[in-house]
């Protein structure tokens, strides 16, 4: 094993989709979604990128969605998120109102 490399760890999270994201992917939730992390950590941007790889329909709204980790908004997607099996990741597009 090379020095300086963190071990890759796969965690399984539960995804929740709201509003437009739910319409695009055709479901409101998906359990046991695998995320490859670096020692249990992954940036919000990488989490969203992995979700968009699995659900390419979301690419159209990727730049406007917010993600939440265990009901806490991830305001800075460059920050690492500490992830564990069973955590909840919500994909929340902007809600239009009138």
Curated annotation (Swiss-Prot):
Post-translational modification here is noted as: C-terminal thiocarboxylation occurs in 2 steps, it is first acyl-adenylated (-COAMP) via the hesA/moeB/thiF part of MOCS3, then thiocarboxylated (-COSH) via the rhodanese domain of MOCS3.
The protein's job, in short, is: Acts as a sulfur carrier required for molybdopterin biosynthesis. Component of the molybdopterin synthase complex that catalyzes the conversion of precursor Z into molybdopterin by mediating the incorporation of 2 sulfur atoms into precursor Z to generate a dithiolene group. In the complex, serves as sulfur donor by being thiocarboxylated (-COSH) at its C-terminus by MOCS3. After interaction with MOCS2B, the sulfur is then transferred to precursor Z to form molybdopterin.
Q: Which UniProt keywords apply?
A: Cytoplasm, Molybdenum cofactor biosynthesis, Nucleotide-binding, Phosphoprotein
Picking any one GO biological process from the record gives: Mo-molybdopterin cofactor biosynthetic process
Localization recorded for this chain is: Cytoplasm
**Keyword Kinase belongs to the record:** no
Sites bearing Glycyl adenylate, chain numbering: 98
Name this polypeptide is given: Molybdopterin synthase sulfur carrier subunit
Species of provenance: Aedes aegypti (Yellowfever mosquito)
GO terms, molecular function: molybdopterin synthase activity; nucleotide binding
Origin: domain of life: Eukaryota
| Other remarks in the entry | This protein is produced by a bicistronic gene which also produces the large subunit (MOCS2B).
What interactions and quaternary structure are annotated?
A: Heterotetramer; composed of 2 small (MOCS2A) and 2 large (MOCS2B) subunits.
- Quick one: which pathway? Cofactor biosynthesis; molybdopterin biosynthesis
Task: Kindly list the positions at which 1-thioglycine occurs in this protein.
Answer: 98
Record-linked Pfam families: ThiS
Q: Which InterPro entries match?
A: Beta-grasp_dom_sf (IPR012675), MOCS2A (IPR044672), MOCS2A_euk (IPR028887), Mopterin_synth/thiamin_S_b (IPR016155), ThiS/MoaD-like (IPR003749)
């Amino acid at each position: 094993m090379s020095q300086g490399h963190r071990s890759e760890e796969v965690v399984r999270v539960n995804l929740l989709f709201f509003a437009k994201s739910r319409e695009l992917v055709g479901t409101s939730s998906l359990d046991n979604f695998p995320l490859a992390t670096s020692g249990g950590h992954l940036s919000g941007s990488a989490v969203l990128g992995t979700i968009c790889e699995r659900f390419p329909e979301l690419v159209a709204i990727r730049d406007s969605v917010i993600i939440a980790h265990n009901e806490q908004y991830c305001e800075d997607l460059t920050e690492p998120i500490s992830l564990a099996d069973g955590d909840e990741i919500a994909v929340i597009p902007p809600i239009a109102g009138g």
